[in-house]
């Protein structure tokens, strides 16, 4: 028997003599409707990363995989850490072996299939680590391109994926300019960072924030002027990734270098 996902992929609607692919329509999703019509919340979750404090230990990645049951050995992760090594001649070298799940065990740059690249210490101008995750944008393109409403935004601004509605079309994966989405290796539906929404709803911090021993990651309510994260964002120089795309990302960075894309 054909399930709903298979039906949605193959279904065509005939109207007025025209054949219209179902992917051109918006399928009703009651959960998304509730998220859109629930009114403005007093909470808008945002994330803050302090580049100066990140040491690339990988504890955050481990914690995320365990908390959210992300396949341990599969080459997928909801959050990861990139290592940047900038040489004096201006070359930018970036790696993130296993998403930094095990930290950075070698001083050499992991170039995947190309192999390891050794950079002499005297040639290095600067080096730093950059944690990345879903930006839970105010204007999320992934929500806009999903043809069945499986990707939606909560009243608190968290972007989620409803596995039971996702048909695995991949539009959201291709539509995300941050490359934070992937296909679940077994369920074949879109997956991403949920900002540990299940924990936030219980008054807990995200798993990655709890796991970071140096306070490089923080989560807060931008609509609360007394929130420590809000105070930092409103009083210090912070940056976001790919601001030019107009997605209005809500992951803010302290100490973000111009080399980071």
Regions found by a protein language model. Give the residues of each.
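Non-ligating segments of multi-cofactor redox enzymes
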Residues: 1-261
